Amino acid sequence: MTEFTVHLVNRPGALATLTEQLADAGIAIEALAAFGVDGEGMVRLMVNDPTMTRKILQSDEISFEEREILITTLRHEPDAVAVMTRSLADAGANIDAMYLLRSSAEGLEFAIAVDNHDVAHNILAV
């Protein structure tokens, strides 16, 4: 899955404008995390149509990066995240970003960006 990191001005309405543009194009947001860093708004999002999202961001000259994200589901137990992150670390895979997508009785679904997809793919069995 593709994750976009979008750079916005950190002011009221910036996120609303971005999400309205996506909605107007029929793009569904699958995951979103937004936060301010040193006066800049940063939005990490995954969508159902990366190609159209890329076109919208480029045509509006919005600064962004994109990268491939691994999706994995862990058992819903206290040590699950610790075991996974330790396994990745011991194999030499650095976690660049990680966030929870869903929590349910079936498990914890995470999006993970790593510096070595092959290693992480083998460990996570995704």
Residue ranges and their predicted role:
Residues 1-126:
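A conserved regulatory-domain signal marking ACT and ACT-like small-molecule sensing domains
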